């Protein structure tokens, strides 16, 4: 006989003594004399033990006879309470030796004989919710009964619908403590019954999950529990193919297909009704009193599992296990596609929808779909147009409080989230979390054009628009197009004149937060200072000569990871960015953008001190430092001073005569690579710099600049 069936025989042996115990009936269960409170029904199913056909086949004849005797005793005791309506036909079935599952069908139905409500069984009611009020309104059924677990065990927190069930359950704790046949067990008719109950205590929570350590009293419970770890969902709905871990979950789901709308009707009321029932502990409100009652268990139920790290208490054990993973960092549930790990199976299931593209939640207004119900709920607030949360600084309004809280950080400039690896700081936790992934996970999505890699597929798709020239976002005012929506929104502020970002020191307003941040540095400007702690650390590496990022191809080292990434593109030999004027190709888009300025001759960056103009902001920034900071690096040979150490080292080659850069065509040597590159154009005949007035071409931009002076030269 299976262990499960054997456990039921043990349960069977103390089913009758529980009813026979002197304290098993509460005052609410006594027969009233006259008016007063209604009598609460104790029914056959509350104490019956039912075997499946498979389990019944494994019982011996002696055990089957024992079953019949005990169940007949149960019938007698229930009948003695005066309110059991199944006495005659159930006792007849027992005497005839009917199988237990046949009797269960006879006694589990509890319909009103007059109106036959479509609520089939007490078990179905329990599965559809912890509390359900059913009104019996005909004849002897005129009794209000609430299937709520009112009676709670002080030892383990387990709740029961009837005090008799609680009394019987508490004997398990008493027997577990005494292990003696004495006063606590006086309700048992036979010592053998007590001996069987002792075996329940020894088997209680004997079967342990080998993944999380949770224990169970039956192997079937362990198997059911372990499906949470494996993600296995063996029960599939024939109608919609949705899969479930448990058969009971499938049964509940199938009611939606067959027309049982009890739960749907109850749910729809949540959209129309107010919530009059409030929790005195936390203030949470509920539609129904039964929901409040169930919620109160969170505050009142004893919590047995204490976290060793933070001393927080949890119940049940599964919540305790999930909480501990926040301290240990354990993530046992791994995605098969990208190998990302999660603390719980529910988070893994949510994540997997990002790979499948499944978006089952659709907005009724705009038909946009979402992977998560919470994302849909957030989106739907957009359609209401209601923006209840107002920023006190700039009067901008927001749909959600969380958006307002994030926005306020733009006015204060506070960056509370700092990366411990590179010391970069962030205003928002979401950006900080994304940044941390750059240190821990790879970049599996690579661009076929330039080889640049990305962590997320949507980032790659956005990048590809640079190569294709696709700009689907058009400004309605001026027709200018952009490759992403965020750049379009920034541009629109030019037309609206909207300037929500105000400097708290001088009152100047800006359309973008980035412009405000740049402006605020002018107030806090100090010599040799950097924009942030992270930039200061980067700057200090230039003095120390520290270059921790080496190239695997040529072993050249760099002070910044970003510089290494730019350098590595040289080894691929790919130059996907082409100048439309001279057809010269570049590794990076920024290089192409800078190069285009050489054709126009435009110099938009002008120094206010000496009025010297520059094509590129980087050269302009370097030039400004010549006016503001010293030149600490001095040549010992000629006394010439330099701002940067590498420039001094380059200068020293003039004195030593060192010329390590040799031309492969003519053998001429140079002391730096830039001079060699200029020289090579003599051999190639390359003349990319064309005068826009006479069409003459030059190999160097400096020669073009000198030539253009001749066109602008005027006689006095």
UniProtKB/Swiss-Prot annotation:
GO terms for biological process: regulation of transcription by RNA polymerase II. It is found in: Nucleus. Residues 515-548 are annotated as: Disordered. Its main location: nucleus. GO terms for cellular component: nucleus. Keywords: DNA-binding, Metal-binding, Nucleus, Repeat, Transcription, Transcription regulation, Zinc, Zinc-finger. A zinc finger (C2H2-type) spans 151-173, 207-229, 235-257, 277-299, 305-327, 333-355, 361-383, 389-411, 417-439, 445-467, 473-495, 501-523, 549-571, 577-599, 605-627, 633-655, 661-683, 689-711. Pfam families: KRAB, zf-C2H2, zf-C2H2_6. The keyword Nucleus applies. Residues 42-113 form the KRAB domain. Signal peptide: none annotated. GO terms for molecular function: DNA binding; zinc ion binding. Belongs to the krueppel C2H2-type zinc-finger protein family. May be involved in transcriptional regulation. This is Zinc finger protein 840. It comes from Homo sapiens (Human). The gene is ZNF840P.
């Amino acid at each position: 006989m299976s262990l499960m069936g054997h456990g039921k025989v043990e349960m069977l042996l103390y089913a009758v003594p529980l009813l026979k115990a002197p304290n098993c009936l509460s005052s609410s269960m006594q027969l009233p004399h006259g008016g007063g409170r209604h009598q609460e029904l104790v029914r056959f199913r509350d104490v019956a033990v039912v075997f499946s056909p498979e389990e019944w086949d494994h019982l011996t004849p002696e055990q089957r006879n024992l079953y019949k005797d005990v169940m007949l005793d149960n019938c007698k005791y229930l009948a003695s309470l005066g309110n059991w309506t199944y006495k005659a036909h159930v006792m007849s079935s027992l005497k005839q030796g009917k199988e237990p599952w046949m009797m269960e069908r006879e006694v589990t139905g509890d319909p009103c004989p007059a109106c036959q409500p479509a609520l089939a069984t007490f078990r179905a009611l329990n599965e559809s919710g912890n509390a359900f009020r059913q009104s019996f309104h005909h004849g002897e059924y005129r009794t209000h009964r609430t299937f709520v677990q009112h009676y709670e065990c002080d030892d383990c927190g387990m709740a029961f619908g009837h005090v008799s069930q609680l009394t019987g359950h508490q004997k398990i704790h008493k027997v577990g403590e005494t292990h003696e046949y004495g006063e606590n067990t006086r309700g048992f008719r036979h010592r053998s019954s007590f001996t069987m109950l002792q075996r329940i205590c020894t088997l209680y929570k004997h079967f342990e999950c080998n993944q999380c350590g949770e224990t169970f009293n039956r192997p079937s419970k362990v198997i059911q529990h372990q499906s949470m770890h494996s993600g296995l969902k063996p029960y599939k709905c024939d109608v919609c193919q949705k899969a479930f871990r448990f058969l009971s979950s499938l049964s509940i789901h199938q009611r939606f297909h067959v027309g049982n709308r009890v739960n749907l009707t109850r749910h729809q009321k949540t959209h129309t009704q107010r919530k009059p029932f409030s929790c005195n502990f936390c203030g949470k409100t509920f539609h129904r009193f039964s929901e409040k009652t169930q919620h109160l268990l969170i505050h009142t139920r004893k919590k047995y599992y204490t976290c060793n790290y933070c001393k927080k208490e949890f119940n049940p054990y599964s919540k305790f296990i999930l909480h501990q993973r926040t301290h240990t960092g354990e993530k046992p549930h791994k995605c098969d596609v990208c190998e990302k790990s999660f603390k719980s199976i529910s988070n893994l299931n949510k994540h997997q929808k990002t790979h499948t593209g499944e978006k089952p939640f659709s907005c009724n207004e705009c038909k946009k779909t979402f992977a998560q119900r919470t994302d849909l709920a957030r989106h739907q607030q957009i359609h209401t147009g209601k923006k209840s949360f107002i920023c006190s600084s700039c009067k901008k309004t927001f749909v959600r409080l969380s958006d307002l809280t994030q926005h306020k950080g733009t006015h204060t400039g506070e960056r509370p989230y700092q990366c411990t690896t590179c010391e970069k700081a962030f205003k928002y936790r979401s950006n900080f979390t994304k940044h941390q992934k750059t240190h821990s996970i790879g970049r599996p999505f690579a661009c076929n054009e330039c080889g640049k890699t990305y962590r997320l597929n949507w980032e790659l798709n956005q990048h590809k628009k640079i190569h294709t020239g696709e700009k689907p976002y058009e400004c309605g005012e001026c027709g200018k197009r952009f490759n992403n929506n965020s750049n379009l929104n920034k541009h629109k502020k030019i037309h609206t004149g909207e300037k929500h970002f105000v400097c708290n020191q001088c009152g100047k307003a800006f359309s973008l937060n980035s412009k405000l941040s740049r402006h605020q540095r002018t107030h806090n400007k100090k010599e040799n200072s950097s924009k942030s702690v992270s930039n200061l650390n980067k700057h200090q590496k230039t003095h120390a000569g520290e270059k921790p990022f080496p190239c695997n191809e040529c072993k050249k080292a760099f002070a910044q990871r970003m510089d290494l990434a730019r350098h590595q593109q040289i080894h691929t030999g790919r130059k996907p960015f082409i100048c439309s004027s001279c057809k010269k190709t570049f590794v990076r888009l920024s290089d192409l953008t800078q190069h285009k300025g050489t054709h126009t001759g435009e110099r938009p960056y002008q120094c206010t001190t000496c009025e010297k103009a520059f094509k590129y902001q980087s050269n302009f920034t370097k030039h400004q430092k010549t006016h503001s900071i010293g030149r600490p690096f001095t040549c010992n040979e000629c006394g010439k001073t330099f701002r940067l150490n590498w420039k001094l080292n380059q200068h020293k080659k003039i004195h030593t005569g060192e010329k390590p850069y040799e031309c492969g065509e003519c053998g001429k040597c140079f002391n730096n690579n830039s001079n060699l590159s200029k020289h090579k154009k003599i051999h190639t005949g390359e003349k990319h710099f064309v005068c826009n007035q006479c069409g003459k071409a030059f190999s160097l931009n400096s020669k073009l600049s000198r030539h253009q002076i001749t066109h602008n030269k005027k006689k006095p």
